[in-house]
Amino acid sequence: MPRILIIAPNWIGDTLLAQPLLARIHQRLPGVTLDALAPAWTASVVARMPEISRVIETDFAHGPLRLADRWRLGRNLRTEHYDQSVVLPNTFKSALIPFFADIPLRVGFVGESRYGLLNVMHKLDENKLPLMADRYAQLAEKPGDPVAPRLAVPHLAVNEANMLITMARLGLDRSKPVAVFCPGAEYGPAKRWPAHHLADFAKRLAARGVTVWLLGSNKDREVGDDIAAQSGNAAINLCGRTDLAAAIDLMSVARWVVSNDSGLMHVAAALGRPLVALYGSSSPEHTPPLAHTDKLVRITRIDGLECSPCYQRECPLGHFRCLNELSPERVLLELDALPPALAA
């Protein structure tokens, strides 16, 4: 049976948007083994994908080339005898390891002029394929062939035992309905709903008898503390207190998720959680959360602003209207319009 190495994207959201590609490969090649090469910060997500047999975790950070290290890893991977590699990032360096591993078929987009490193080249027509999920899915087809109808949306396995252990460690319970807030956004502050809005929203939910958990990385710990304090501890700050795998498992019990445009937003959709997705400087046109049904996601933003989306890390005009004017009342209406959660 064929063995294929997937070079996974470097962002959590992009990684989940690549899952329909994996389903398509399995459809085209029954019995295929898919392994994935993934950075440490996304490996936990890839490991929860049923299409993936094995995750090879790397420590390559954004930026440095580390050519010698990539050469050594590629040489070591020669013993795996992969038949093909599919390279999802467009960077030059992401195509080096399959080349050094001497994998016969190396598939990907031209990207950063990767002639020679790749030998099955796709040219990307961004206007024809505006959605990132469809762009990735194109790599399962022959160059120039149309993308097949989407087979599946992202889906992540949940580790029930790990969830219970994490809840016990953190002193959490599910005696009340749980809402999860994801206050972070790796890209920058222009994608983050203000802390005072989140705190106000947490108090409104607490008044309804809802338990509010804040999930995020250690980078979000400070803003989580701020939200918890402003909410009178209506929100429990778990940012930085779990790894990504535990965050996935905790999120799986949420009755609702409210998230900025971030990796955890895509995790919520993959878990079938009813989701209010908040957009400010970014747009859902290219990388929307993919859910089992559109009714599970409420895309929420301020319409009619000429300056939005600006795709900037910080508001270039200083007023931050796109998220400042997104009121807790509006978000509560969106949350109330959501259907019940699906089984995770």
Give the positions of each predicted feature.
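Catalytic machinery of carbohydrate-active enzymes
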Residues: 1-344
